[in-house]
């Protein structure tokens, strides 16, 4: 399985508090496999699964594993929360062994996760597990902390369903072109990935067609604001038709009539 680096954060702890910097690939000494684990199970069962943490650096690292809740906002941004705060979290039902460990250079550790699935569980639940290194001293007096995460989905297949709707379609003329804003809402109880397009028509003829970015994530009961940028339009009246593929049996569509002045 391909190793993945997901949500990597490099923290530089200086004399003026916490500063976040973007690491280069040379800075990263830890990776995890898999970056996303999907566990299909049944209510009331206990399950155990491994996540492999590998030290790719030239020196030993000390790592602490911890769970976190999260939400994905309408623009795709992640917000983290303490374990057990989210209604779709199983943080309190998951145990980690070992929680703290050392890894020698070029070696790896398999960390075991056990989950006691509640008897009334339905649909899909999600968590992040962070693997955080002990601060190490670098040049300039900074202490460097590396943090990398793996995403965990616990899925009850018999009660999982996907669904979606378009709540609104709007358009906005900006300097870089015509922006088509599509509000998608996940009406199911599992995460989905979006694709699709907008078609702009005038007098029955298609004058522009814009594809959405691929693989936009919308978590259970979440929302996504899709921003598709097309060419500038000449003044006039147009019809905008948005079509979203969320992985269900049919596309969902929304339409708006706009006037460009």
Predicted regions span which residues?
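Surface-exposed binding patches on compact interaction domains or structured appendages
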Residues: 28-34, 57-110, 195-198, 202-208
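Short edge beta-strand/loop segments characteristic of extracellular beta-sandwich folds
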Residues: 50-54, 114, 179-187, 229
């Amino acid at each position: 399985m391909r190793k993945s680096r997901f949500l990597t954060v490099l923290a530089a702890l200086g004399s003026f508090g916490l500063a976040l910097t973007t690491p280069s690939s040379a800075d990263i000494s830890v990776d995890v496999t898999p970056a996303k684990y999907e566990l299909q199970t049944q209510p009331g069962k206990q399950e155990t699964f491994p996540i492999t943490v590998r030290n790719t650096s030239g020196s030993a690292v000390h790592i602490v594993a911890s769970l976190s809740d999260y939400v994905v906002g309408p623009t795709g941004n992640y917000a983290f929360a303490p374990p057990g705060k989210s209604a779709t979290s199983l943080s309190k039902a998951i145990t980690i062994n070992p929680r703290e460990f050392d890894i020698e250079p070029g070696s790896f550790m398999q960390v075991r996760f056990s989950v006691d699935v509640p008897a009334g569980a339905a649909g899909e639940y999600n968590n992040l597990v962070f693997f955080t290194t002990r601060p190490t001293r670098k040049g300039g007096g900074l202490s460097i902390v590396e943090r990398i995460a793996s995403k965990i989905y616990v899925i009850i297949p018999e009660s999982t369903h996907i669904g979606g709707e378009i709540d609104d379609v709007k358009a906005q003329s900006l300097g870089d072109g015509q922006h088509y804003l599509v509000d998608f809402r996940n009406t199911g109880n599992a995460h989905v990935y979006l694709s699709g397009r907008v078609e702009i028509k005038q007098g029955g003829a298609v004058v522009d067609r814009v594809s959405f970015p691929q693989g936009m994530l919308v978590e259970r009961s979440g929302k996504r604001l899709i921003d598709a940028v097309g060419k500038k339009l000449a003044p006039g009246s147009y019809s905008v038709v948005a079509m979203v593929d969320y992985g269900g049996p049919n596309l969902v569509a929304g339409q708006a009539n706009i006037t460009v002045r």
